[in-house]
Amino acid sequence: MLFRSKGETHFRDIDVEWVEERPGGKLSKRFPATGIIFRETPGSYDYSWHPAPRRQYIINLDGAVEITASDGEKRVIGPGEVFLVEDVHGKGHFSKAVGGKMRHSIFVPIE
């Protein structure tokens, strides 16, 4: 999760709480969403400092993206990972493609 505190963007890990178990697997509570946006990002993607356009979950389907928070911490978000961006004001974060590979992702706005 990317969030903003005292003017800086930081990472924070969050765990999903499983509230129901069925024969087909575990389920979390329902989270609010206002739609989905499909995105294809070229392998040359290198986007300098920017805030997120809205609070949203990003579900990485393939490829990877390196995210740098404004506090300097870097993380690589790989295939199958979900992250929540909430740094909608201020310097934001820096993001770039990993390994020159195209990436497909889904944005799930929550506002």
Enumerate the predicted regions with their spans.
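A short glycine-rich, His/Asp/Glu-containing loop-to-beta-strand
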Residues: 5-49, 103, 111
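Short, Lys/Arg- and Gly-enriched loop/turn segments at beta-strand edges
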Residues: 22, 91-97
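Short histidine-centered beta-strand/loop micro-motifs
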Residues: 26-30, 46-52, 68-69, 75-76, ...
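Short beta-strand segments in beta-sandwich/barrel cores
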Residues: 36, 46-47, 64-68, 82
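Short acidic-glycine-tyrosine-enriched beta hairpin
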Residues: 40, 70-88
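Short, conserved beta-strand element in jelly-roll/cupin
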Residues: 40-42, 50-67, 109
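A short hydrophobic beta-strand segment most commonly corresponding to one strand
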Residues: 84-88, 98-111
